[in-house]
Amino acid sequence: VAGYQAYLYKQLNPGVGVRENIDTWAWRPDKLNNQLTPLRGKPQIQFTQNWPRLDGATAAYPIYASAFYALSVIPEDFHVWDYLDNSRTQEAYNKIVNGDADIIFVAQPSDGQKKRAEKSGVTLLYTPFAREAFVFIVNADNPVNSLTEQQVRDIFSGAITNWRTVGGNDQEIQTWQRPEDSGSQTVMQSQVMKNVRMISPQETEVASMMEGMIKVVAEYRNTNNAIGYTFRYYATQMNADKNIKLLAINGIAPTAENIRNGKYPYVVDAFMVTRDNMTSETQKLVEWFLTPQGQSLVEDVGYVPLYPTMK
């Protein structure tokens, strides 16, 4: 279904776009020239049974998939998909609440996700393991290179509607949003907009096996008047595109150094989310990610580590 929806969307919306999904086959050890990141040194822990079930956000998959394959001793009849999934933030939160995942690698939860966990009587633990930047993207030909925090809020609340107002061309601003409960939308609402109401998102229709054509939040389209948002790692490594540029905020670019020193305004933590009654194997993996070897993997994949790495 997802493949057909993607095909249909491309037919209805030709041109360059950014879709927050990936081909997980690129992160398999049996694929030639795979994109898995190796550990520094021999694995300091290994799993031979009772493997933790991992899931999470699209942008976190390279981290937890690389860890899974590096730390697991996998028998021949092993069904990897029972333990390694990428159902994205919204569904990953549902799975951890329902007990169908042991660790999910995600951004902070939305208010709705917190309430659903509370309603289910589930206590979730949030362990930060990496630092990331929430970034704003525009067409590379857009003359605007930086916005202030207030200008960002004004654009996405509808108070500013023309690029000329912020030093750009005399063009209407086309804003693109992310679906409710996605990691990007949660950060946008909580850390960027704060209490300012956003304008309604653009929508598109896609095919649903159950309901025919349904409306969903439209994906970013990189027209010369567009602005959208995502996470730095996704925009610069997983979906790098020379036709897209990242804006500075308050004149500060979202570089690794500015994430590390906290100067970039929208620095966020990536979390490992677990249930409070986690297994010993799950606890072992959570703790490993905070060790120098685990933090080195975080750094080598392309994130900013929170703790010391291996020399």
Which sequence ranges carry the predicted segments?
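Exported/periplasmic ABC-transporter solute-binding proteins
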Residues: 1-132, 137-311
